[in-house]
Amino acid sequence: MREIVHIQAGQCGNQIGAKFWQVISDEHGVDPTGTYKGDSDLQLERINVYYNEATGGRYVPRAVLIDLEPGTMDAVRAGPFGQLFRPDNFVFGQTGAGNNWAKGHYTEGAELIDSVLDVVRNEAESCDCLQGFQMTHSLGGGTGSGMGTLLIAKLREEYPDRVMMTFSVCPSPKVSDTVVEPYNATLSVHQIVENTDESFVLDNEALYDICFRTLKLTTPTYGDLNHLVCVCMSGVTSSLRFPGQLNCDLRKVAVNLIPFPRLHFFMVGFAPLTSRGSQQYRALTVPELTQQCFDAKNMMCAADPRHGRFLTASCMFRGRMSTKEVDEQMLNVQTKNSSYFVEWIPNNIKASVCDIPPKGLKMSSTFVGNSTAIQEMFKRVGEQFTAMYKRKAFLHWYTGEGMDDMEFTEAESNMNDLVSEYQQYQEASADDEADEFDEEEGDEE
């Protein structure tokens, strides 16, 4: 019941995805061969959200793995949980997209897309009542961004009434993997604004910061970063997979967090994040979790929520706790930091409580916020885009695949519109008069 089909595209998407299935399998007591080795009926009660039960009681992930080159797939297949996936669900090309959005979206990716859609259709048909799709991908590369957005557009046509959610790794301000990131990201955002229901924005730099500052890791690897992403992904879907006192599903998250259809880019955070050495010195309480998950240092995207205001937010708690306490804390956060929440949406925090904590913790909370501060990220990418596009730098790689200049201009203006929409709602007040107070407050930050 209420199944989710998981799609991972490109290198980044597949690496996060592989880690995600480790985390989920761990929570549900499924071992790397797909056999159930858990100790509690609760693990099996709704295991079919993410798993198909095959013959002989084997649990197979509802996952579709796509890439335009075989490398990452082979690594996933050789990895610890590689034998878990259905071999037919690995769909890959041989050429690679070479960090080129146009290759992923128009040429190489377009050739592969039909076989991907067949596999996705196959997964969707084996569902009782498909709730939606979740995709992990990056926006800076070629396959995850180009082919990922192509697939999103195609699925949108075919399943218009199902939730489409993405976990998108955006280019970070200081750490850049690719010179043409701004192009790829802007072209992707152009698609994502129109075709997805909810996008969780992550970025490597913020994840590195969490690893350094909070987890006190001296040399964080991509494995550590991906693990952080996965705890969030697991938290967002926990109340679908385990019984809870206050449930939420993908649709509820969307309804409660998106006041205007285009503004569906969320920041995510997770608590408790403590370094390995200092865990035993901290009490895990609901106030502590709430305080930590609203903390700017815990946001997994390089935009500071203190520079904007929250339109809406949602806290998903896991573990045994009193719902009364959760409600009190939510109210507390809103009254204490009222200037960080727009006043024209009263009670704009949604809470949910799921009884089963993640492995190794007594309780945890996942934070999802729709903050106007996320415009910082779009603004930054947009500026880099404009700087390169002004000089038509690197453009021949894209036009060579049949793209038109117009598409770039459109994507650029769509991104700028998005930024100004966020800005407009950040400044709006309940009585809709230009509040001088608000403007001054914005300058002080």
UniProtKB/Swiss-Prot annotation:
This is Tubulin beta-3 chain. Residues 417-445 are annotated as: Disordered. It comes from the Eukaryota. Its cofactor is Mg(2+). It comes from Oomycete-like sp. (strain MacKay2000). Dimer of alpha and beta chains. A typical microtubule is a hollow water-filled tube with an outer diameter of 25 nm and an inner diameter of 15 nM. Alpha-beta heterodimers associate head-to-tail to form protofilaments running lengthwise along the microtubule wall with the beta-tubulin subunit facing the microtubule plus end conferring a structural polarity. Microtubules usually have 13 protofilaments but different protofilament numbers can be found in some organisms and specialized cells. GO terms for biological process: microtubule-based process. Keywords: Cytoplasm, Cytoskeleton, GTP-binding, Magnesium, Metal-binding, Microtubule, Nucleotide-binding. GTP binds at Q11, E69, S138, G142, T143, G144, N204, N226. It is found in: Cytoplasm, Cytoskeleton. The keyword Lyase does not apply. GO terms for cellular component: cytoplasm; microtubule. GO terms for molecular function: GTP binding; GTPase activity; metal ion binding; structural constituent of cytoskeleton. Pfam families: Tubulin, Tubulin_C. SMART domains: Tubulin, Tubulin_C. Its main location: cytoplasm. Belongs to the tubulin family. Residues 429-445 have a biased composition (Acidic residues). Residues 417-426 have a biased composition (Polar residues). Mg(2+) binds at E69. Transmembrane segments: none annotated. Tubulin is the major constituent of microtubules, a cylinder consisting of laterally associated linear protofilaments composed of alpha- and beta-tubulin heterodimers. Microtubules grow by the addition of GTP-tubulin dimers to the microtubule end, where a stabilizing cap forms. Below the cap, tubulin dimers are in GDP-bound state, owing to GTPase activity of alpha-tubulin.
